[in-house]
Amino acid sequence: MKEAAPMHFPFPVRRSVWLNRYSTFRIGGPANYFKAIHTIEEAREVIRFLHSINYPFLIIGKGSNCLFDDRGFDGFVLYNAIYGKQFLEDARIKAYSGLSFAALGKATAYNGYSGLEFAAGIPGSVGGAIFMNAGTNESDISSVVRNVETINSEGELCSYSVEELELSYRSSRFHRQQEFILSATLQLSKKQVSADHSKSILQHRLMTQPYTQPSAGCIFRNPEGTSAGKLIDAAGLKGLAIGGAQISPLHANFIINTGKATSDEVKQLIAIIQSTLKTQGIDLEHEIRIIPYQPKIHSPVSEK
C-alpha cells in the first residue's frame, strides 16, 4: 500500500516520533506528527489549526497512567513542555501543567507550604494530576485546587472553578471534554512540613509499589470499600506474566514492563484480570487511559 503523502503544517513538526520514549510504561510506536509545546501562544496556534482541519490530536505530559499502542498514534501528539510555578499571596501557588507533580510537592514543602505532601512519588505532570484528580488514600488534588486555566479546541483561553472541574475519584470533566490544561492555582497553608513525613510517604510507596520499574501506575480503579490490588492478589494472579508484561509481584494492581512488553501483552493481562474477577461478581474498571492507534476525532485524551 502506498504511504500517504505527509501533511503540511504552518509550524515546525517532527514526524514518526516513538511514543515509548514519552511513556513511563516504555511502550508505544510512532506518532504520525509530534510537537513539543513550550508557550501558551504556541499551544493556542497548534490547537486552533488542528481543530480547523478536524485532525485528531493527543495531549501528553509525563506519559504516566496511559498505554500507547505498539503501532503508535495515527494523529498528532502535543507534548506539554509548559513548565514553571509562581508563589502568590495567601499561600496560593500557580503551577503550569507540564511541571512534574512530584517536583511541585517537593518544592512547596521546601518553601514552607503544606498541602501537597501526598504528591511525593506520584508520577506525571500537574496537568495529568488535574486530568485524573491524582491522589492517594490520604488526599487528592481536589482538596487544594481552586482554579484551572485551559485552552479549548478553538484555541480560546478558559477558566474553571473547582466546582466546575467535576472532580471525583480519578476523574474530571476533561475525560469527556478535550481541552489543553494550562495551569492550576492551588490553595496551600503556610506551615513547615516535616521532611521526615514526606520521606515516609515516599518510602512507603517505594516499599509497596514497583516504583523503579516501567509501569503506568495503578491499572484499575479501586471498587468502593476495597482495593483492586488485594482482589487481584486473592484471585492468585500476582506475578502472572505474558511475554514482557507481568502483574507486579510487589503490588497486584500494577502491570510492569520487564523488558520488551507490548501493548497487546498488557491488554491480555488486563483482560485476564477482568474476566477472572468477573466470575466472582466483581467488575474492575481500568484507571489507565488505553490510547488507540486510530483515535476518534476530538475524543478525550490523556494529559498525564
Swiss-Prot record:
Catalytic activity: UDP-N-acetyl-alpha-D-muramate + NADP(+) = UDP-N-acetyl-3-O-(1-carboxyvinyl)-alpha-D-glucosamine + NADPH + H(+)
Entries under Gene3D superfamilies matching the protein: 3.30.465.10, UDP-N-acetylenolpyruvoylglucosamine reductase, C-terminal domain, Uridine Diphospho-n-acetylenolpyruvylglucosamine Reductase, domain 2
Pathway it works in: Cell wall biogenesis; peptidoglycan biosynthesis
Residue ranges crossing the lipid bilayer per the database entry: none
Enzyme class: oxidoreductase
GO molecular function: FAD binding; UDP-N-acetylmuramate dehydrogenase activity
UniProt keyword annotations, A-Z: Cell cycle, Cell division, Cell shape, Cell wall biogenesis/degradation, Cytoplasm, FAD, Flavoprotein, NADP, Oxidoreductase, Peptidoglycan synthesis
Biological function: Cell wall formation.
Organism: Chlamydia pneumoniae
Protein name: UDP-N-acetylenolpyruvoylglucosamine reductase
Cellular component aspect of the GO annotation: cytosol
Pfam families: FAD_binding_4, MurB_C
Required cofactor names: FAD
Highest taxon, organism lineage: Bacteria
Residue intervals of the FAD-binding PCMH-type domain: 26-191
Listed EC numbers: 1.3.1.98
GO biological process: cell division; cell wall organization; peptidoglycan biosynthetic process; regulation of cell shape
HAMAP family: MurB
